[in-house]
């Protein structure tokens, strides 16, 4: 094997990464540093410390990255109203560049010459982790066990763990049949019955939300305060970025908001079905578009809408740390200087409805837009010349005999 002296492993403490830890020690005969990130996945991360210690790991990093995740990754993404393929709010994709960044930082701190991750050779995450790592540390070695070993089934992983004395839990019938990934922005479900695109997902699959049918019969109203494109307060109470998202997840989930069942196009070429719960993100997207509707110039808003699919694709395919994403981010952030104000929302049985928006930076002028007399604020006769000039090219073409019928 390649000459690797020390490797930083993205470690959850679960079966896969525990097997990877032992496999790295045996296969590469190297020292392993473990890194466990708390991104708000809702599971205790401290048990990973004891598991790593039991396997002889001396350098263990367990980092609470929730605030950084929302402040520096989720919020910047939502400033662009980012959606991949019309529906997916990129909950998994946006977490990977932060993990890659921290892996490289720890590698630099510990003198490690390699990093390792547990992403499979079929998915997008391998690309996201590694593109980020190479962008931040060009000479780093990346070890992806799923592309090297022959442990290609869960049963083989279990056998390997038992053979090498790795503590594992044999789950009974209550074990979820789905592959799940969670952070503060969302929780995803793949595999199991979802691999049949005609089979409806099971109701007990969902972890964060009630079904819209069982949501309260009374609507919930909330007000979100924006400053420079980011939410800074809920119902007038200022909160940190991570607290904002956590609270919106709780409120949205209680009202059956944020469920999604889609088939997406993976970067590696295949189609994949996934179900997602993104209650807070669903609310944030609706509210952000609402505050922009009164604060953004028309052409700026339209240009943002044109750029968004490219920006979304860059995040989905792992190019967060690319120069083109950084360039787009500067443009997006510049557009948010005047995106300030308050949005009022009605949450009811899976629906998010904007019922009010206001801002000191609003470009909406009721005196001009009114259907009543406007006191001369807008001269309707001016529209005739405007229409004639915009019709000029079409009239010329028609006069040349270029029929459209």
Swiss-Prot record:
InterPro entries assigned to the protein according to its UniProt record, in alphabetical order: Arginosuc_syn_C (IPR048268), Arginosuc_syn_N (IPR048267), Arginosuc_synth (IPR001518), Arginosuc_synth_CS (IPR018223), Arginosuc_synth_type_1_subfam (IPR023434), AS_cat/multimer_dom_body (IPR024074), Rossmann-like_a/b/a_fold (IPR014729)
Pathway: Amino-acid biosynthesis; L-arginine biosynthesis; L-arginine from L-ornithine and carbamoyl phosphate: step 2/3
UniProt EC number: 6.3.4.5
A GO-annotated cellular component: cytoplasm
A single GO molecular function term of this UniProt record: ATP binding
Keywords: Amino-acid biosynthesis, Arginine biosynthesis, ATP-binding, Cytoplasm, Ligase, Nucleotide-binding
Residue numbers binding L-citrulline: 88, 93, 124, 128, 179, 188, 264, 276
Pfam family, any one: Arginosuc_syn_C
Coiled coil: none
UniProt binding sites for ATP: 10-18, 37, 118
One GO term (biological process): L-arginine biosynthetic process
UniProt-annotated binding residues for L-aspartate: 120, 124-125
Record localization: Cytoplasm
Claim: ATP-binding is one of the keywords in the record: yes
CDD domains: ASS
Subunit-structure text: Homotetramer.
Recorded family membership: Belongs to the argininosuccinate synthase family. Type 1 subfamily.
PANTHER family (alphabetical): ARGININOSUCCINATE SYNTHASE
Protein's recorded name: Argininosuccinate synthase
Organism: Pseudomonas putida (strain ATCC 47054 / DSM 6125 / CFBP 8728 / NCIMB 11950 / KT2440)
Gene: argG
